[in-house]
Amino acid sequence: MVDARGSTPCLIGDSIRNVNDGNSLDFQYTNQFNEESEASRLLTPQTSSNHALSKMQKDDDIRDRSYTSVAELNREGALLTDEVDLENVDASKVRSNRDDLEAEEKRKKLLLLKKKQRNKSINSESFSSPSLRASKSNSLITSTDPVEDHISKYSSSGTPENITGEADDEDEDIIRNSYGQMIKNNSNRPHLAKGESYQSAEQEIDHTAPEKSEKRQERSGRSFDRQKSSAEFLRSLSRSISRGPTKNKTVSPSKGEDSRMYSTSNYSISLVDLENGPKIIPETLEEEQEDAEKEGVLMEDEGNEEYTKDLEEAANKAQPQ
């Protein structure tokens, strides 16, 4: 920092903050530059605004045309400001909650109307001729599960009978399977809560059914197969229990030690025979070997086997002389 006289202040024993540099050349040049820039800005305000606008336009040209900036909307008057009369805003296109409620009510009415039409079509199909229903049931493609399991009776003319009266018990037992065939409903048998069992239900089915082969062909919830498999399982279980070893076997005191038995799941032997087993087996093998030697079955390895005279004579004749 140099003052007007060209000398530098001495900082020995003093601080730089206490130095008066108002007369320095650097301070005078800085103040003069700031005053000139402020005067030029005050004299030409229109020029600065035009420069800013041109710069914005250049930026807009460079930017993507599909994007609209907030500044553009504000210049065009698209944004609501304090200068706009908010009371005169056109709100005719704004949807209210009342319109939503009316639309919801209309939608519910349409759904109810469609449901009624569907019920009418189902009722009309149920009153159709039995021949048409039979032709539909024969096809696996067109057959569907019925809405109601109750099947009404038809007269020879094709009109339904006993529609208003009470349904018979036979009709309640008849249902339609997934193939469209009419079968008896035996899915609720046996009724275990009433004390029935699978054996009683199987006997009842065999007694009431005219032919057993036809009963097996019906698909009544596979109740017949379940009853049969359960009966077979019970029989096999009783057989396996009867084959098992007798746990409560009494031993008579007169037999003594010979009555002690070694039992397994399949057989039982005496403990005496079990202890004497290693001695009995070699004796049995020796006896069998002696019997075989007596019968002439075994041959010695030394080559001094004894043959009968007939065999020796036949062998001598066969040898070439």
From Swiss-Prot:
Phosphothreonine, modified sites: 44, 159
Biased composition (Polar residues): 43-52, 120-145, 153-162, 178-189, 237-253
Region: Disordered, residue numbers: 37-63, 115-270, 283-321
Primary localization class, coarse: cytoplasm
Composition bias, Acidic residues: 284-305
GO cellular component term, pick one: cytoplasm
Phosphoserine, modified sites: 49, 69, 121, 126, 129, 137, 139, 238, 240, 242, 270
Localization in the cell: Cytoplasm
Keywords (A to Z) from UniProt: Acetylation, Cytoplasm, Phosphoprotein
Record-listed N-acetylvaline modification sites: 2
Bias (Basic and acidic residues) ranges: 204-229, 306-315
Other known facts: Present with 18600 molecules/cell in log phase SD medium.
Protein name per UniProt: Uncharacterized protein YLR257W
Taxonomic source organism: Saccharomyces cerevisiae (strain ATCC 204508 / S288c) (Baker's yeast)
